[in-house]
Structures are given as C-alpha cells and as structure tokens.
Amino acid sequence: AALAPGETLLVHGAAGASGLAAVEIGRALGAEVIATAGGEAKAAAARAHGAAHVIDPRREDVRAAVLDLTGGRGADVVFDPVGGDLFDSALRCTAPLGRILTIGYASGRIPQIPANLLLVKNISVIGLYWGFYMAWGKTRASPALRAKVREMFAELFALFEAGKLHPEVDRELPLSGFAEGLRRVQDRGVIGKIVLVPGGDDA
C-alpha cells in the first residue's frame, strides 16, 4: 500500500495478531495510526503497540470518528482483516488517492464494493492472499515476487531486532487445545495470537 511517513493509517481489528503488527509497522514507518478495537482491553493493547487513537466500532460511528480525527480528509491507507461493515465504513472515510488493503473477512461478510466510490476519490483496493506467495494451491507467485517477499521479511526481522515489533501472545496451548484456541478466536476473546505448543500432554 506504499504507506509514507506522515500519512494516516487506519487499522481494523487492531487487537488481533495481524492488526497489532500493522499498528506497529505503521508507527515504525512514521504514520499516524488510528485503530478500531472492541472493548477497553483490546483498545489498551492497540494503544500499547502504538495506536495514537482507538475507535470502538460497537459504540462509535467509525466513519465520523476517522473524519473528525483527520480534519475531514480521511485515512490515506486502510488495513482491513475484518470486512463487513468496517470495510463499508472505510470506503467512506478514505482520503482521495487512498489505498485499502484487504486481507480477510473475520466479520463473516465479504463486502461488495460500489465502484463509483473508487472512481470519484481515486481509491485503490488491494487484495493480499498470503497463499499466493507461499505457493499454496494452483496459483503461484513468480520467482521475482518470491524474492520480493524475502526482502520484506528481512525488513520485518530488522524492525523486530530493533525493538520496534512486539508480537503479542494471548496464551500458549498444547496441540490438543486446538479446539479451545479456535473457539476463543471465534468468540473474539483473543488479543494477539494463540500459540500451539507440541509436547506436554501431547507427548
């Protein structure tokens, strides 16, 4: 999405593993980060990882809040792993020439995009499916793209080594706890990620 220093990044699902990473990467790149997160514990996690502002979509109008925080301009880049209503609101609070990065649909609803909104504000919507780069399924990235992914990982590791990325582990479970972990994720009770650890009662 070519996020530049001084731009505004809106991160949906900011208390999830990818959302928290997006908040930290945005801050490391010099962006002003606005996060959406439901509940005070998740909002606190987003702030702790670098969000300047947190909006609770269960209690606030996301579009109105983003426009208010940006002086009516909107967000330059939107990171969206949620889809559904949050994607709909993002379309209406993205700045002219803005970019929306869609990586998943945790809400359970794949949004439909009114193309006229893209046209009148010159907005780009960018899809990112990780399996394409990892050669899952029939579609595979070219060697040149895979080389680019290695470069990006090198940048991420450099940020981690510099202390700018702090992966959040909600809890560790044995492999036999997979169903419990999945249930917690589905119930939206997780901040960061759940790690399944081989061994213990799985030995």
Where are these regions (language model features)?
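Short internal alpha-helix immediately C-terminal to a glycine-rich phosphate-binding loop
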Residues: 1-29
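Glycine-rich phosphate-binding loop and adjacent beta-alpha segment
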Residues: 85-164, 197-203
